[in-house]
């Protein structure tokens, strides 16, 4: 069984109660993606929210005679980024469906610029762009929440959007998948990049549904806005008949389902038929493993010619898919089971048929006939216009509010902002439920606001018991000793090749905890000194996960023998 040993203080199943004292010797088993860069810059900066309003003195305690400052007034977020406001930016929207060449066009501008930054929603995309630019002799740094790969003489950066630097000046910048400003959890990071990146040219790539909102938001910034519309480069054909059985699966197919359990069930069923091997892609797989699985699926020299995946294929991976097959058009979104939205269906379906690939014409259908009407109507419909973008108070505002209310913990501060934030009609407060769960834990520890905030915005899945326990242990050890050694948390000799999907999930969880340690080590280097060890352990986890995905596949001795022969030929 793959697991690591954790010496933990217990937390509640939901991860929101206080950290409790553990019994001596009790052992707990150990389980991201948002990363945050400049959001963690400190210093209370009093902003001038209205033009020509002067520079009033603020009473942070509420006991003086000077004017009080309303820290919950978020009506003018464009004023939070003075460097960008000094520029009259040329903002170019590249909008169109999947496989329309919109991002390719923007990247051409980035390659030709004297300095620039690419901001993507996923590490996978940042990796891909950094690799592309460096190959084109454009020196490019790679910066994500968990890694910093600096290239000598770099003039460009490829970053995850949360790591976007709003204090630097660029010739050219790209924000990819800009429609994610409307994401309930991560939208604020895209809004921050949209308002805060100081670039002469800012290229925004995404769905046409975002255009009216972006144009409205940028009316107050003085930027010039252009809209370039793209059409799909290769046909996408909605089929009129379903795939009645997985026995009809063929080479190049991608079967889409929305639970980890179903992914492995379909994989097992397809492989038992003896015709195909399946690669798998889903969100909780490490990014490195997702890339490896996509590469294996695309490689025509091996037998992994079918993909079983979640909506994680919607962005970040280049895939040679002939046909998308929806096993269902419903998904559980964390609170309820609902129909897929028009945007979700179009994003996933659009992955079929890739320009200049083995399958230039894409097809899309369902397993069940009753799902076809929704599929067809969604593909014909435009995505609903986005009406609001996510927003979240800067640390400056939270820190100022904390000084005005010194008895309030971070949980109370976040709660107050959610309940009392003043917003313009273009914005909504991002969902801070997960942040508040972490805040409830760290508020019980002797930590400063800066340190609490760091843990609150860290890439932890608080809805996973093991992940929540890992964060609690890190915070507890940090508050007690100021240093967190990895050997006190993980027992690497207990990590073994998983034999079942359940054991695989535990190994994926270990990888996430190691990922969290690396993230913290890049921000608290002296307190989390074992970054190299954690990175090494992550690599081992990736290897073991790959071994499981390769080994847990064949029930046919003949097919297994053929796979072994291919492996020997490739050595």
Curated annotation (Swiss-Prot):
Its cofactor is Mg(2+); Mn(2+). Keywords: ATP-binding, Helicase, Hydrolase, Mitochondrion, Mitochondrion nucleoid, Nucleotide-binding, Nucleus, RNA-binding, Transit peptide. Its EC number is 3.6.4.13. A motif (DEIH box) lies at residues 176-179. Homodimer; in free form. Component of the mitochondrial degradosome (mtEXO) complex which is a heteropentamer containing 2 copies of SUPV3L1 and 3 copies of PNPT1. Belongs to the DExH box helicase family. One of its GO terms (molecular function) is ATP binding. It catalyses: ATP + H2O = ADP + phosphate + H(+). Its main location: nucleus. Residues 83-212 form the Helicase ATP-binding domain. GO terms for biological process: megagametogenesis; pollen development; positive regulation of auxin mediated signaling pathway; positive regulation of cytokinin-activated signaling pathway; positive regulation of gibberellic acid mediated signaling pathway; positive regulation of response to salt stress; positive regulation of response to water deprivation; response to salt stress. CDD domains: DEXQc_Suv3, SF2_C_suv3. It is an enzyme of class 3 (hydrolase). Activated by the presence of mitochondrial RNA. This is DExH-box ATP-dependent RNA helicase DExH16, mitochondrial. It is found in: Nucleus; Mitochondrion matrix; Mitochondrion matrix, Mitochondrion nucleoid. Residues 213-399 form the Helicase C-terminal domain. Weakly expressed.
């Amino acid at each position: 069984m793959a697991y690591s040993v954790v010496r933990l203080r217990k937390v509640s199943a939901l991860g929101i109660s206080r950290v409790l004292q553990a019994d001596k010797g009790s052992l707990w088993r150990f389980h991201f993606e948002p990363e945050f860069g400049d959001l963690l810059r400190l210093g209370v900066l009093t902003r001038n929210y209205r033009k020509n309003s002067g520079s009033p003195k603020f009473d942070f305690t509420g006991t003086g005679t000077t004017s009080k400052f309303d820290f919950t007034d978020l009506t003018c977020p464009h004023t939070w980024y003075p460097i960008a406001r000094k520029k009259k930016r040329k903002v170019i929207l590249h909008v169109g469906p999947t496989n329309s060449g919109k991002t390719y066009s923007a990247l051409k501008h980035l390659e030709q610029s004297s300095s620039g930054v690419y901001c993507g929603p996923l590490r996978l995309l940042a990796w891909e762009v950094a690799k592309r630019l460096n190959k084109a002799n454009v020196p490019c740094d790679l910066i994500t929440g968990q890694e910093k790969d600096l290239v000598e003489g770099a003039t460009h950066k490829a970053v995850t959007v949360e790591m976007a630097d709003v204090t630097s000046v660029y010739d050219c910048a790209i924000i990819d998948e800009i429609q994610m400003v409307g994401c309930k959890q991560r939208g604020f990071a895209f809004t921050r990049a949209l308002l805060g990146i100081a670039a002469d040219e800012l290229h925004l790539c995404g769905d046409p549904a975002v255009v009216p909102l972006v144009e409205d938001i940028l009316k107050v910034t003085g930027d010039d806005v252009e809209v370039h519309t793209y059409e799909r480069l290769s046909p996408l054909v909605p089929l009129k008949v379903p795939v009645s059985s997985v026995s009809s699966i063929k080479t190049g197919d991608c079967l889409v389902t929305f639970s980890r359990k179903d992914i492995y069930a379909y994989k097992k069923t397809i492989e038992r038929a003896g015709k195909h091997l399946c690669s798998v892609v889903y969100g909780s797989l490490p990014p490195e493993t997702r890339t490896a699985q996509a590469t294996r699926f695309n490689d025509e020299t091996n037998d992994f010619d079918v993909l079983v995946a979640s909506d994680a294929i919607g962005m970040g991976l280049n895939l040679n898919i002939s046909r998308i097959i929806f096993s269902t058009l419903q998904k559980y979104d964390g609170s309820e089971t609902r129909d897929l939205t028009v945007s979700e269906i179009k994003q996933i379906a659009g992955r079929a048929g890739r320009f200049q690939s083995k399958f230039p014409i894409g097809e899309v259908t369902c397993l069940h006939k009753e799902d076809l009407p929704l599929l067809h109507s969604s593909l014909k419909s435009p995505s609903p216009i986005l009406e609001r973008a996510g927003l979240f108070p800067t640390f400056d505002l939270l820190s100022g509010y904390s000084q005005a209310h010194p008895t309030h913990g971070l949980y109370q501060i976040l709660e107050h902002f959610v309940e009392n934030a003043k917003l313009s009609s273009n914005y909504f407060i991002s969902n801070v439920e997960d942040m508040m769960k972490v805040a409830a834990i760290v508020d019980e520890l002797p930590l400063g606001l800066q340190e609490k905030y760091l843990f609150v915005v860290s890439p932890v899945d608080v809805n996973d018991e093991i992940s929540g326990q890992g964060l609690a242990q890190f915070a507890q050890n940090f508050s007690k000793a100021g240093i967190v050694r990895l050997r006190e948390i993980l027992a690497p000799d207990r990590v073994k090749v998983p034999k079942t999907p359940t054991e695989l999930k535990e190994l994926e969880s270990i990888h996430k905890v190691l990922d969290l340690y690396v993230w913290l080590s890049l921000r608290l280097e002296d307190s989390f000194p074992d970054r190299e060890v954690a990175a090494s352990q992550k690599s081992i986890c990736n290897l073991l996960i790959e071994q499981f995905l390769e080994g847990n596949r064949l029930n046919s001795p003949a097919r297994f023998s053929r796979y072994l022969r291919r492996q020997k030929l490739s050595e």
